Amino acid sequence: MIETIQADWIKSEAINLENCCNDNPLKILGPHFYEEQWVIRVWVPEADEVKVNFKDKTYKAESINHKWLFEAILPENPNSNYEINISRGGITHTQHDPWSYREEWMGEVDRHLFAEGNHHHIWEKMGAHLIEDKNQKGVMFCIWAPNAKSISIIGDINSWDGRHNPMQKRLGGIWELFMPMMKEGDKYKYEIRTQQGHIYEKADPYGFLHEVRPQNGSIVSKLKNFNWSDSSWISNRDSSSQINKPISVYEMHLGSWLHESTDNKYLDDNGEPRDPVPAADLKPGTRLLTYPELTKKLIPYVKERGFTHIELMPISEHPFDGSWGYQVTGWYAPTSRFGTPNEFREFVNKCHEEGIGVILDWVPGHFPKDKHGLAFFDGCHLYEHGDSRIGEHKEWGTLIFNYSRNEVRNFLVANLVYWFEEFHIDGIRVDAVASMLYRDYLRPDGEWIPNENGGNENIEAVKFLQQANHVLFQHFPGALSIAEESTTWPMVTKPTDMGGLGFNLKWNMGWMHDMLDYFEIDPWFRQFHQNSVTFSITYNYTENFMLALSHDEVVHGKSHLLHKMPGDDWKKYANTRALLTYMWTHPGKKTIFMGMEFGQRQEWNVWDDLQWELLEFEPHRGIRNLIDDLNKLYKNEPALWKNDFDPYGFQWIDCNDKSNSVISFMRRESDTNEWLVIVANFTPNTHGSYKIGVPVEGFYKEIFNSDGSRYGGSNKGNMGGKDTINYNIHDYQNALELALPPLSVSIFKHQSEK
């Protein structure tokens, strides 16, 4: 007989369980040795009767001190080799006891690495994991919430009632619970009770799958159950630096590339129709494509265009389509809008089979305030700074990560490793880096806090970015890490051991703004703005630059690329072709946004798909043909990519002909006599005999002309090429006398034989 003091303690603990205020349920629940006998205590809210099955015998569990706390006496130590039989409302079922699993899931070494911020595979411990332990199948849950008073697992398994399954608090603010009755596909959340008594229902920060919006629960999902076939791709990728290869990127948004009619159902592997995910109210009767459908339609399209990589705007789970994916709540989960994690793995796998790399937009700079997300996670500012002057982007309505906290950095750095390791991606583009680097970013005076040295640099964010890139290249030496950094912060693409941020590419925002400003000017006035088209070369070799015409430039009233151009339709098409061709010949890797490859007219709208009907018209097919041929030429001519980051690879012939708005230059390959001559005419004037100097006499084949009829141009040019003439110009003794078509860029290559 248990003594009175013991009975009072048990009653007190049971009341705490009922009120969801118990952080140590193992202290009372599960197997215990009391007064020379083994006792099983189980907590079963609203149960009518409970029995314990052990070694082919059944032992009745009596309700003790509380109507939902049951106790059975067994003849020996049962360990976890018993089951509980529960009768509730006339329904009886048998299950293993959640509190029979008493061992720590996250061991001392794991906790130590996590607390240091150096557990690069923390997702293998945190979150929901399908495991088999001691012949028990179930799900192990593990979460970090050091300030919580209590946490429970809620879901379909317990009617979303937090009184059923309280978690056990471990050292380091870690909470754990093994749920033997749960399985793959079960929905769940964490019910977190704060020290102040408030209750939050949170999705799993480490969840591998979440519900389709507008629902926001997490879903138990297997992690390592996909058979990859891209080992040769990965081996080749990591054997050498990728930035010394041609890189031509198709940036796109999976949800607005192409829609499908809701009448056309998607059938899964079992032939069953999948519930459609509506595209948007703006276009009723349409649905989003699934990952398998995108695999069949998008990958062949990108391959046909000749791009080397696809860049996907954020696919981490996010609740609001209108955020374009940049307000993430499910960092470890591909969005379920398009399907399952394994279906996305198959998408990546197929990309690699077709020779296409996959880049993901990654958003470590901020996160939304959605109640089910990271904000105020355990009743305190856990992931974000407590002071809004450093912890909030008021203009964006989002919160900023507390990069000074080891566990927060670990969450993000491990997330980076996760996408490369678990989904075999090839690169990331880090969004809004400038917003991370500066404490006063988009903040008026008085609404930001200087750093310890009195400056505006965010020292903690700098260290985080350096750590993230260092760890990334340590694990994946062939990765691409691209910074969207819009200021003149130094050494963005220099290694971390040199004091740099450690990226290997940076979007050239200056080039983008200068070129768009220049091309929006009426061609007759471009002579007064020649510097806009030439200035980028003066700083081109300070960083490893990527030229990007991105999604940001075709929204919010900015017009799509074609409609930025002045003049009538003929001039718009010609200007677009000239800009794209100049971009492909300018030093730097390439990125364009979807729709630019065929001259989309309308601004990008996340709620709609692209204007594919425009391809019925020749000028739009011409722009698409131009991109196809530019990508083919680009990959076949090393002079266009091999020395992107070496001044040897570029040389002006003439950049001073302002009155004609003509520029000419050479692109050179290293250690060879291979070079290309590029001449751009940025006015509608046709020049019949325009002379430029060249270093070697002979025949120069015209290998590309943006004014060609295949591209919708007037087909003016140089009849396949030109022989040099003996004429001293531009410090050369040989010259080419060329026909320059209107609003065009022409490319010539010296031939050893005509």
Curated annotation (Swiss-Prot):
A GO CC term assigned to this protein in UniProt: cytosol
A single GO molecular function term of this UniProt record: 1,4-alpha-glucan branching enzyme activity
One annotated GO biological process: glycogen biosynthetic process
Name of the protein described by the UniProt record: 1,4-alpha-glucan branching enzyme GlgB
EC number assigned by the record: 2.4.1.18
Highest rank taxon of the organism: Bacteria
Organismal lineage: Bacteria, Bacillati, Cyanobacteriota, Cyanophyceae, Synechococcales
Alphabetized CDD domains for the sequence: AmyAc_Glg_BE, E_set_GBE_prok_N
Catalysis: reaction(s): Transfers a segment of a (1->4)-alpha-D-glucan chain to a primary hydroxy group in a similar glucan chain
Functional description taken from the UniProt entry: Catalyzes the formation of the alpha-1,6-glucosidic linkages in glycogen by scission of a 1,4-alpha-linked oligosaccharide from growing alpha-1,4-glucan chains and the subsequent attachment of the oligosaccharide to the alpha-1,6 position.
Keyword DNA repair tagged: no
Keywords attached to this entry: Carbohydrate metabolism, Glycogen biosynthesis, Glycogen metabolism, Glycosyltransferase, Transferase
InterPro entries cross-referenced by the UniProt entry: A-amylase/branching_C, Branching_enzy, GlgB, GlgB_N, GlgB_N_E_set_prok, Glyco_hydro_13_cat_dom, Glyco_hydro_13_N, Glyco_hydro_b
Catalytic site positions: 431 (nucleophile), 484 (proton donor)
Keyword Thylakoid carried by entry: no
Gene expressing this chain: glgB
Oligomeric form and interacting partners: Monomer.
